[in-house]
């Protein structure tokens, strides 16, 4: 279970290649970026692919390091059976992901316009003049 989950977080050489192309701006204005990236990736030499694979092995994502830290902490409790430790780890990780998603969605919401606040302030000012 853990091996499969951690591998899902790992960065692949292809994903690194995509991020490199995106950073350089070569994907801007292309109608089918997936097709373009696939073609470019297949054209890479063996040396370039090996360099990408090396970088991918060294790359880590914040989610991967957070999961490893949590897994180490949860699995170190030897007084609890291994099945229960795994269940606890899965439960806590899912709760963490849900909290992060909620936080991200909250951050993406557009702020309310100041129009209503301006109207309220104008009404208060109008009432105070009377």
Swiss-Prot record:
Listed Gene3D superfamilies: High mobility group box domain
Keyword Transmembrane annotated: no
InterPro entries (UniProt xref): HMG_box_dom, HMG_box_dom_sf, Kinetoplast-DNA-binding
Gene Ontology annotations for the cellular component aspect, listed alphabetically: kinetoplast
Biased composition regions of type Basic residues, renumbered to the chain: 103-130
UniProt KW keywords: DNA-binding, Kinetoplast, Mitochondrion
Record region (Disordered): 95-130
Quaternary state and interactors: Associates with the kinetoplast DNA network.
Family classification: Belongs to the KAP family.
Protein name (record): kinetoplast-associated protein 2-2
Organism in which the protein naturally occurs: Crithidia fasciculata
